[in-house]
Amino acid sequence: MTTTPLSPSTPSNVQVPDIQGRFGRFGGKYVPETLMPALAELETAYQQYRNDPGFQAELQQLLRDYVGRATPLYFAERLTAHYARPDGTGAQIYLKREDLNHTGAHKINNALGQVLLAKRMGKQRIIAETGAGQHGVATATVCARFGLECVIYMGVHDMERQALNVFRMRLMGAEVRPVAAGTGTLKDATSEAIRDWVTNVETTHYILGSVAGPHPYPMMVRDFHAVIGQETRAQALEKWGGLPDILLACVGGGSNAMGLFYEFVNESSIKLIGVEAAGEGVNTEKHAATLTKGRVGVLHGAMSYLLQDEDGQVIEAHSISAGLDYPGVGPEHSYLKDVGRAEYYSVTDEEALAAFQRLSRLEGIIPALETAHAIAYLETLCPQLDGSPRIVINCSGRGDKDVQTVAKFLIPQ
């Protein structure tokens, strides 16, 4: 199977940002004046190249030969049997295997697209933020491929729990800058990356790693990841002659979920479910369930749901998963929540750890802790379902990076 063009095949009534970059009341450009010309330049370049035949040809060739797309749509036979009813019926569970991409996660789809764009804009220096390290690794990878200077900002707490990915980034020539401010996690790394961009905007392109931030990033990152849903549509039609009934993905900033969802937003019969990190519980102060418990505010250049205190100050998020440990969410997810097109739930650290072990033992697939949150929601979802609906879960990344973290909590029996 070949990869499909960047432009989605979804009908034209899909909500896309307006010229101000808004999804309903969400999104926008809440940035210093210094960055407005850079965002305008980026949007102009993206609109110029997104459907340019030469750009598309290079992107598709690299996605195929360098990244390894298309990724399989895998029937999880033993996981399906685990949730089957006594009569053998029940949900049919499929995994969209983004973990099989080069670098081990979905993140390279976006990093590759943005680097090709940056090259055409004449930028020679690339910066990025990272939490779990997968976006940092993907960015370092494509910078090595094209010989570009690469600086990655990463919170000191995340560097400790993702030491393997830190080494991988440095191995490929990236400079990894520790961020000790705040909680030393993804929010703080993002803030530092934006400060760098403000200072070096003439020579530097900022590869934001999620569907967050100021316009055009939420739209652009979504579009570069839309290949996930496009392939899923084609593969589902090939495998069973229809479409999935339910799409399930973890949500931190929300890029892997939007990559899967976007192709199907106008297929009203398909349920879209995002799963956030409940941490130690949504009724504690240690969680990252932004769409479950957040209120509308502005963070990192966009209006969206945020975790805030009574004074409107952004509060610390918590998750065992570094990639979900973020107090905001992409504005398109906030829009999909408000209009009722997608549903968002949360699972705890403990539930995610159990799912991490369950998928490993039942399928021989070690998922990222982020992905494990989506897998964990099957415990709640499957008993509620009638018949044998087909569920596609975005297996957004592999869990090699998380083994040391998990080993502190799980002792294999």
From Swiss-Prot:
Belongs to the TrpB family. Its cofactor is pyridoxal 5'-phosphate. The modification N6-(pyridoxal phosphate)lysine is found at K107. SUPFAM superfamilies: Tryptophan synthase beta subunit-like PLP-dependent enzymes (SSF53686). Tetramer of two alpha and two beta chains. The beta subunit is responsible for the synthesis of L-tryptophan from indole and L-serine. Keywords: Amino-acid biosynthesis, Aromatic amino acid biosynthesis, Lyase, Pyridoxal phosphate, Tryptophan biosynthesis. Pfam families: PALP. Transmembrane segments: none annotated. GO terms for molecular function: tryptophan synthase activity. Its EC number is 4.2.1.20. Pathway: Amino-acid biosynthesis; L-tryptophan biosynthesis; L-tryptophan from chorismate: step 5/5. This is Tryptophan synthase beta chain 2. One of its GO terms (cellular component) is cytoplasm.
